């Protein structure tokens, strides 16, 4: 049976790992063992932070909606309840964008949500 030499595949593998570690600090960029660990950890961070990114944006949208709604005398929770009662099915991303860029349109949405609320609903102080 013929002898199998793996120098080419090993070199390609090392080149791929060191390419992924390009720009890292210290031995992480040029020592294969340390670079492999750094690249693996970077992948773990990337995977985790793709999930965290969704949470962060949702929190940002809620903060923006809450700020715009409080200026009109409602709280975020009461406003969202009013939207549900009014049958307005806009998601938080769209609501935050409207609140940021189209203030008059958002005031109209707030008015509809207020009108749909039952009498005596809590209003922001």
UniProtKB/Swiss-Prot annotation:
GO terms for molecular function: rRNA binding; structural constituent of ribosome. The keyword Kinase does not apply. Disulfide bonds: none annotated. The keyword DNA-binding does not apply. Belongs to the bacterial ribosomal protein bL20 family. HAMAP family: Ribosomal_bL20. This is Large ribosomal subunit protein bL20. It comes from Rhizorhabdus wittichii (strain DSM 6014 / CCUG 31198 / JCM 15750 / NBRC 105917 / EY 4224 / RW1) (Sphingomonas wittichii).
């Amino acid at each position: 049976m013929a002898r199998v030499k793996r120098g080419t595949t090993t070199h390609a593998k090392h080149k791929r790992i060191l390419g992924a570690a390009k720009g890292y600090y210290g031995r992480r960029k040029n020592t294969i063992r340390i670079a492999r660990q750094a690249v693996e950890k970077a992948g773990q961070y990337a995977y985790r932070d793709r999930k965290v990114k969704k949470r962060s944006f949702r929190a940002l949208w809620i903060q923006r909606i809450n700020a715009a709604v409080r200026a009109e005398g409602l709280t975020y929770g009461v406003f969202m309840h009013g939207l549900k009662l009014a049958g307005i099915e806009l998601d938080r991303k769209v609501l935050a964008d409207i609140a940021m860029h189209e203030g008059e349109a958002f005031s109209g949405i707030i008015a509809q949500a207020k009108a749909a609320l039952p009498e005596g609903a809590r209003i922001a102080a």
